[in-house]
């Protein structure tokens, strides 16, 4: 398990640099020469049949240092096993749906783009995310719903998971139930109003609200096989991670930063909280052992994170700050400290600051 974790940590650490740091060790000239062969700008996004409702005015707070509500594409985290970003031409892209279905099918990119398109805001999260970490991002995704395609294929009784494969053969396994339960599970072609960036799955990727990316966020997807959990263990499941991966209720302090030296007086503590497909009901901030209710920004959808803030009357001295959230089902974030394996880290994000 250690070797696999080391590899995962390496890939996570590459982040938005798209593994450029590894170029010297794996053929930097090859990485640079092939990375931009396909130009996503040639794709023209189809207008969605129904546009999302406008964001509530108070959804995005204007607090310096707070994560923006929408994560810019260039800053969106990247975690995958591709040391060289795949170059997939829309003209040659196809998606095969097969396995435990009555009507196996193959769909081309042109056929996909003729299907009804929607836009939906979804916060994606990596299971490798440590408490308080940065491998989470929110975007407006454009695509077609996956469920109607699967209904057309005719899912057979007993099918439990969809094994999704990318152009390089990497596989992820997502449970059938959450994909078919009415949530906006997408074959996405757009991100924040632009065609998918290459590093985030161009021309087509999967985005399923409420599940960690290692089971749901297949980039460069070209194959979906309906099967059972007993018949196949996907890549990360073989390495000790859970088959089902609902995202846990979590929260993070964005400002102030850990170790900050702050002036006495009114200090704004702010951050984000998330419980995708359940939504955030409340956030509390702990200062030196006492809990205080934070103010929440507006909720976009239950599939996105929610900004929050608390104005703290800071007094001189060292202080410890913590945060916890409660989701809309009434379940609070757990205080139990646990690492990411096998299904996501837990505990309260905690930082130390000093007030002069």
Q: For the regions a protein language model found, what residue spans apply to each?
A:
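N-terminal secretory signal peptides and thylakoid transit peptides that target proteins
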Residues: 2-18
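Hydrophobic alpha-helical membrane-insertion segments, chiefly the h-region
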Residues: 21-29
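Structured, non-membrane catalytic/scaffold regions adjacent to prosthetic-group chemistry
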Residues: 29-356
